[in-house]
């Protein structure tokens, strides 16, 4: 009896994983919305002696060391989130990159989630597990995320800068307490309620919840992120058509760069109120397609871009930029297009 080639390939991969790691849980079930090759695995986290789930793929028929993409789900989802998240997996399969999509404690509404120490431990452990189970090129380990994943990527840039060759952050929340206030005022109570459930209450001034929110906020840690090539992106309509005002990314920029490069508070306030950037001429960036940059600043390894869009990611720009980064080298702000990726508006706007 002959079996379909794709089935044979997947079964071979599963048997290989199981034989190398007998105690490892590997699911052979298809992952809805993902390429057939993607597997569900569980990996150990020493911080609380737990096993955490993730999606994983490695190029089994590719002997050379390969880049590792750590893709991070959005605020209200988990490691099984498809849509735009599955596009990261497609890129990896097409380009022989290693892919891991950790749960990092799931939806951001529990004390264990939302930028906790366990979140950081989970992602660090996911990287270590991938290195033990695949031929990872340690000079090309990347992180990517939008919305809640953007929050996590910024947090990682400050808390684990030694890991990354490049981090692509889109529409991230840089200040948990500020976002609680903003979502409450904007009638987006479900996000404010998520924050309160994670903290145990509202992050009111001088409260323990505020202290916890500060600990979970990228702004607290981004001062240590300058060695990491970090590309911060945000749509100019976010905060109106989306849930995260683009001011979060401008404040993230300010937290990293020296005083001479910081954006004045009055400029940030006026920019958000008017949606009119400075008169600076921003060159066309072909990787952004119809979502062209409207405002851009770069300083050494850090860049911030406000683009013509909303609460979304431009996969082609993000992934081609990451492909040009290598650990120990200065950020490459003029990346070539090394590969294409077909996406729809539904994919780019999946980050909620």
Predicted regions mapped to residue ranges:
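Alpha/beta-hydrolase active-site loop
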Residues: 114-134
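N-terminal cap/lid segment of alpha/beta-hydrolase-fold proteins
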Residues: 26-63
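Mobile cap/lid helix-loop segments that gate and shape the active-site cleft of serine hydrolases
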Residues: 76-81, 165-166, 172-173, 177-223, ...
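Short substrate-entry loop that stabilizes the transition state in hydrolases
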Residues: 62-66, 71-112, 176-177, 240-242
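Active-site-adjacent alpha-helix of alpha/beta-hydrolase-fold enzymes
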Residues: 195, 236-299
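Short beta-strand/loop motif that positions the catalytic acidic residue
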Residues: 232-234
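Catalytic active-site module of serine/aspartate enzymes centered on a nucleophile-bearing elbow/loop
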Residues: 296-351
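Primarily recognizes the serine-hydrolase "nucleophile elbow" in alpha/beta-hydrolase
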Residues: 131-133, 138-187
